[in-house]
Regions:
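TPR-adjacent "capping" and linker segments in tetratricopeptide-repeat scaffold/adaptor proteins
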Residues: 22-27
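Short, aromatic-enriched amphipathic alpha-helices that serve as compact interaction elements
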Residues: 28-47, 55, 59
């Protein structure tokens, strides 16, 4: 279960269509910025899958990379069930359910391309960025989708 949660967590991180590929997360981005980059990228995933994977991988915590990597394996995971449910999503909304100085949990409601709604919890940790002593927000966990009875 922990492995599946960590895997799902990593798959959900990406950037918007106008954003450049993120090789290293930026300390200037707050957790909400990162969450929006991720979900906007998922919304436009099919327009540039390689870029989305690069960004998702870039915002993943090192512990998650160890479990889901290498990046080529991770890329295949993203387009497989149940992880592909977020690809090309239509809309999303979110709220903070837990927050302290180093962790934040978001409950994210997603309208999938299939017109079904589901909720996931996305968890970030403020931690040392790789190749830097600066702090940045990285994905440490994502829950499996919990679907609603009906969509639109």
């Amino acid at each position: 279960m922990v492995k599946k949660t960590l895997i799902l967590l990593i798959l959900l991180v990406s950037c918007s269509g106008s954003q450049t590929v993120v090789d290293e997360p930026s300390k200037s981005l707050n957790s909400e910025d990162v969450l929006n980059l991720i979900f906007d990228s998922y919304k436009n995933f099919s327009s540039n899958p390689e870029k989305a994977v690069d960004v998702i991988w870039g915002f993943a915590h090192e512990d998650n990379k160890e479990i889901t990597g290498p990046k080529e394996r991770f890329s295949q995971m993203l387009i497989s069930e149940p992880y592909n449910s977020i690809i090309d999503l239509k809309e999303y909304s979110y709220e903070v359910t837990y927050e302290n100085e180093t962790n934040i949990h978001y409950e994210v409601k997603v309208l999938a391309k299939t017109n079904n709604y589901f909720v996931i919890t996305w968890v970030f940790e403020k931690t040392e960025c790789s190749d830097s002593e600066e702090q940045c927000w990285l994905t440490i966990a994502v829950t499996a989708p919990s679907y609603f009875e009906s969509g639109i």
